[in-house]
Design a protein with these regions (language model features):
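Hydrophobic/aromatic packing residues within the alpha-helices of TPR/SEL1-like helical repeat arrays
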Residues: 425, 459, 493, 527, ...
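Polytopic membrane enzymes that build or remodel cell-surface glycoconjugates and lipids
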Residues: 1-484, 488, 494, 498-499, ...
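Structural marker of alpha-solenoid helical repeat scaffolds
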Residues: 431, 465, 499, 533, ...
């Protein structure tokens, strides 16, 4: 069997293994931020909204605070929704996985081109690159990104960065700046795509300008840096301009981009420790969590900070030292890739989530590349020994298979954990016991099963760490209602609004509860407020239809009752129902029928006045209110309506 056939067999085998390992993830559901970006996002339900995806960041999410400018993510979500004919996660996962395979394919060529620059097209390079791609593709930590649907922003933006590099490595695409197109698409997917610019500078400096500390003259160093900067300049101009436009023009003022409750220094310092967490998960991914519970560390002399700082400094020194050797320069490039890719989330811009295991999808590309250079360097230095000893090749193949097998097993298990809300959030409570949100979400799974007492235990546990979290109070309200405690339920909904007035969810859920209590007017006010904050909130729109429908049914019942046994009180009740539903002419007619039965009814004249005010018939409204006050001199509501009418009459003169 010749080498090409053997290599093809390995490629097919690796692809089949990847499909097998991820075979149990395609029906995993929508979780966490998927709710406001996909499930409740009205914008993605019509592909005709495509243009607005690129001009209006509010189409990204139904929550104003989360409306980042990521038009490519919204476009992909809309396309998958259209293909599925609804909210079927299978189609979303198929799309994400397809692009994952494309990314892995491009990574092979990217790695191969870089390694060939350092190792002169050595025959070991393709096999080592295939192993590296397999290692990355099957890595357990990457399952956090592939399973979490809205994290397609991480995976697709990483694909775009790799694609930009592959095009840059080719003569014709580079000549015509075609490599800038995937960079632009990457930035439109997630702002981390702009990190292509500093990575490109390092790539040109190390691999094309052959930068080395061995060069004695400072002028030589400076010349190489300037040349690399010139080569990177087109990407810098486009990338920086696009980033500024996206961030300061297209991103709404309602979007919360950073956490102002912590200092920039404390956040940055804490990231040194977080980096050790990311590194440990790269080597041994045993502490993966869908929602980690890390908190900001404020003491510089905390052992975790000092250990993290030591690790970061050592990695930087290793990277710089590797620049001395042409064959190990790629090792340093890989380490610096890791840090550069982490900059958007691990620098001086504090995020509310101190750490997230799906953030490492992009940085891990660099670590895998760094490993590749070490493996290639060691293998080529021992090439004669490998060829002479007949046991070495099968041993190496077996070792590679064992490594891939172990990470594959871990990935398969993580897919299982992501298979349901209950397994996912239970895992969070075990891995991140101090995360109140994890306990709350696990409580939701218990509430869904009717295990209300267990749900209450989970919610109370959550309140120990997140007592002012609006979603906790929303869910506590839902639970109290299910347990037959309407007064406590309403208190919880009101608390949620007090803690998070700009969140449409607090109004939506309160409105939903009010609808169940047949308090239609209050329900409509709350759902209207939810839609003011989030016009694309699909659940709020559906709820509004229900409220109006049930309100209309109430009107029908009142109409029948008034016709069967007419009375002034019944017509007054009917007029109020008409008024609450914006049927002002009908409200006036009902009041007139009430006056036919009882001509001295001040409430009827007041309701006529209110309706005429709504119709902006100020003169007639004034007369009706004066009649109401004539019949009942202390009628304050009528006085208020009269003042409104008279004020408008004065304005009109």
């Amino acid at each position: 069997m010749n080498k090409n056939i053997k290599f093809t067999v390995l490629v097919i085998g690796l692809l089949l293994l990847l499909l097998l390992v991820y075979s149990n993830h395609f029906n995993n559901g929508f979780y966490f931020d998927d709710s406001h970006t996909i499930s409740n996002n009205e914008s993605i339900r019509d592909l005709s909204n495509v243009w607005s995806f690129f001009t209006d960041a509010s189409t990204f999410s139904s929550l104003p605070a989360n409306q980042a400018y990521r038009p490519m993510v919204t476009l992909m979500n809309a396309f998958d929704y259209w293909a599925a004919g609804g909210l079927d996660p299978f189609y979303f996962h198929i799309s994400i996985f397809f692009w994952y395979i494309v990314q892995l394919t491009l990574m092979f060529f990217f790695f191969k081109n870089i390694l060939n620059l350092s190792f002169d097209n050595h025959p070991f390079v393709p096999v080592i690159c295939l192993f590296l791609v397999g290692f990355y593709g099957l890595h357990t930590a990457n399952a956090e990104t592939i399973n979490y649907i809205i994290s397609r922003s991480d995976s697709f933006s990483t694909l775009c960065v790799i694609a930009a590099f592959v095009l840059f490595q080719q003569t014709v695409p580079r000549k015509y700046y075609l490599y800038l197109f995937p960079m632009v698409v990457g930035i439109w997917t997630k702002q981390t795509g702009v990190m292509f610019v500093p990575l490109l500078f390092l790539y040109v400096l190390l691999f094309e300008e052959d930068f080395s500390w061995k060069a004695k003259a400072t002028k030589v160093w400076l010349s190489k840096v300037i040349t690399a900067a010139k080569t990177t300049l087109p990407a810098l101009i486009v990338g920086f301009t696009l980033f500024v436009v996206n961030q300061f023009i297209f991103t709404p003022s309602s979007t919360v981009s950073s956490n102002t409750t912590v200092t920039k220094w404390d956040y940055f310092m804490t990231q040194w420790y977080i980096i050790t967490h990311y590194l440990s998960n790269f080597l041994l991914p045993m502490n993966l969590s869908a929602d980690p519970d890390f908190t900001v560390i404020t003491d510089f002399f905390d052992p975790r900070i000092l250990i993290g700082l030591f690790v970061v400094v050592v990695m930087f020194l290793l990277a710089l030292y590797s620049f001395r050797s042409r064959k190990l320069r790629g090792f340093g490039f890989g380490l610096l890739w890791f840090f550069v890719a982490l900059l958007p989330s691990s620098s001086f811009v504090p995020l509310y989530q101190i750490a997230n295991d799906h953030r490492t999808f992009f940085p891990y590309v660099g670590l895998v590349l760094a490993i590749g250079f070490v493996v290639c360097f060691v293998a080529i230095r021992n090439e004669k020994f490998i060829h002479k000893n007949q046991l070495i090749k099968p041993s190496l193949l077996l070792s590679a298979a064992l490594i891939l097998g172990l990470y594959s097993f871990g990935t398969y298990q993580r897919n299982e954990i992501w298979s349901s809300s209950e397994t996912l959030w239970y895992d969070v409570t075990q891995k991140s016991p101090n995360n109140g949100r994890g306990h709350m979400n696990y409580g939701l799974t218990k509430m869904a099963k009717g295990e209300y007492n267990l749900a209450l235990v989970c919610f109370n546990k959550a309140s120990e760490t997140i007592p002012r979290y609006s979603y906790l109070h929303i869910n506590m309200g839902i639970l109290n209602n299910a347990m037959g405690r309407p007064d406590d339920a309403e208190k919880s909904f009101i608390l949620a609004q007090n803690y998070d007035k700009n969140n449409p969810e607090v109004y939506y859920h309160y409105a939903n509860w009010l609808l169940g209590e047949n308090r239609f007017d209050e329900a409509k006010k709350n759902v209207d407020q939810a839609l003011v904050l989030s016009p694309a909130h699909s659940s709020a729109k559906s709820l509004l239809v229900q409220i109006l429908s049930k309100g209309a049914n109430t009107i029908t019942a009142l109409e029948i009752d008034a016709l069967e046994i007419p009375s002034a009180d019944k017509y007054i009740s009917l007029s109020l129902a008409y008024y609450k539903n914006g049927m002002f002419i009908e409200a006036i007619e009902a009041c007139n029928k009430a006056l036919e039965i009882n001509p001295k009814l001040p409430v009827a004249y007041n309701n006529i006045c209110s309706s005429l005010n709504q119709l902006k018939k100020w003169g007639k409204a004034e007369a009706a209110c004066q009649k109401a006050i004539e019949l009942y001199p202390d009628y304050q509501l009528a006085k208020n309506n009269l003042l409104w009418a008279q004020t408008e009459l004065i304005k009109a003169k």
